Amino acid sequence: MTANIIDGKAIAKQVRSAVAQRVSERVAQNLRAPGLAVVLVGLDPASQVYVGSKRKACEEVGFISKSFDLPANTTEQTLLELIDELNNDQEIDGILVQLPLPEGLDVEKILERITPHKDVDGFHPYNIGRLAQRMPALRPCTPKGIITLLDSTGVRYKGLHAVVVGASNIVGRPMALELLLAGCTTTVCHKFTQDLETHVRRADLLVVAVGKPEFIPGDWVKEGAIVIDVGINRLDSGKLVGDVEYSVAEQKADFITPVPGGVGPMTVASLIENTLEACEKYHS
């Protein structure tokens, strides 16, 4: 058996097209286009690539896009003042501060400064709390995108045993909340988990987000499972691989996301969806 590929690029394109259509309708009704402000501090090469893709996606769907590229030595106070300005900017519906930030900047303090209704990354404690209480507002982008990918398979995943490997604030923890909301029986594995293999082998639905190349051997994957690989790792050879040993896993899984072209495009698509939602729900 060879797994069905969950094509994140194609699904993300559909999402962007739907958003672009809605933006066109708004403009035709003399309503303003949604606005997204992207803040980049420093010259981290990976961050520059990610920010570039987000800005490009904004332009494609017709958003107002404002960019703020700040030097690495930017003070925390300067960054907080910029966020305050954007919180009060009526053309801006979403504020994104690209992570990681340079050393010396308090990430928690900075992210919490963003007003929750403009927190289109979904990282603010208010938005995470809403998700935990089964009243989601603006949802974290990567987990939200993964739910869209799962829905695309047509598989009824309510009641499935879902295993999330990785417990970061950005992916693992909110992913577990999304899966609970969807009706899965959910296990979260992390660096202190004993006998990881046993947990993984039981997973009907496996989500891996640890940032380590081929960390999960493919033969651990349960026959017929759905595998969502969030990782994207560059080997010394230059090849990009995920956190799961793909070549073996695809022979056992029923559905699997490729790397690249799986989860990554959906993260940006979800950001675009969140910005439109923030505009229409909170700022129109």
UniProtKB/Swiss-Prot annotation:
It comes from the Bacteria. One of its GO terms (cellular component) is cytosol. Keywords: Amino-acid biosynthesis, Histidine biosynthesis, Hydrolase, Methionine biosynthesis, Multifunctional enzyme, NADP, One-carbon metabolism, Oxidoreductase, Purine biosynthesis. NADP(+) binds at G166, A167, S168, I232. CDD domains: NAD_bind_m-THF_DH_Cyclohyd (cd01080). SUPFAM superfamilies: Aminoacid dehydrogenase-like, N-terminal domain, NAD(P)-binding Rossmann-fold domains. Gene3D superfamilies: Leucine Dehydrogenase, chain A, domain 1, NAD(P)-binding Rossmann-like Domain. It catalyses: (6R)-5,10-methylene-5,6,7,8-tetrahydrofolate + NADP(+) = (6R)-5,10-methenyltetrahydrofolate + NADPH; (6R)-5,10-methenyltetrahydrofolate + H2O = (6R)-10-formyltetrahydrofolate + H(+). GO terms for molecular function: methenyltetrahydrofolate cyclohydrolase activity; methylenetetrahydrofolate dehydrogenase (NADP+) activity. Its EC number is 1.5.1.5, 3.5.4.9. Pathway: One-carbon metabolism; tetrahydrofolate interconversion. GO terms for biological process: L-histidine biosynthetic process; methionine biosynthetic process; purine nucleotide biosynthetic process; tetrahydrofolate interconversion. Catalyzes the oxidation of 5,10-methylenetetrahydrofolate to 5,10-methenyltetrahydrofolate and then the hydrolysis of 5,10-methenyltetrahydrofolate to 10-formyltetrahydrofolate. Belongs to the tetrahydrofolate dehydrogenase/cyclohydrolase family. Homodimer. HAMAP family: THF_DHG_CYH. PANTHER family: C-1-TETRAHYDROFOLATE SYNTHASE, CYTOPLASMIC, C-1-TETRAHYDROFOLATE SYNTHASE, CYTOPLASMIC-RELATED. This is Bifunctional protein FolD. It comes from Pseudoalteromonas translucida (strain TAC 125). The gene is folD.
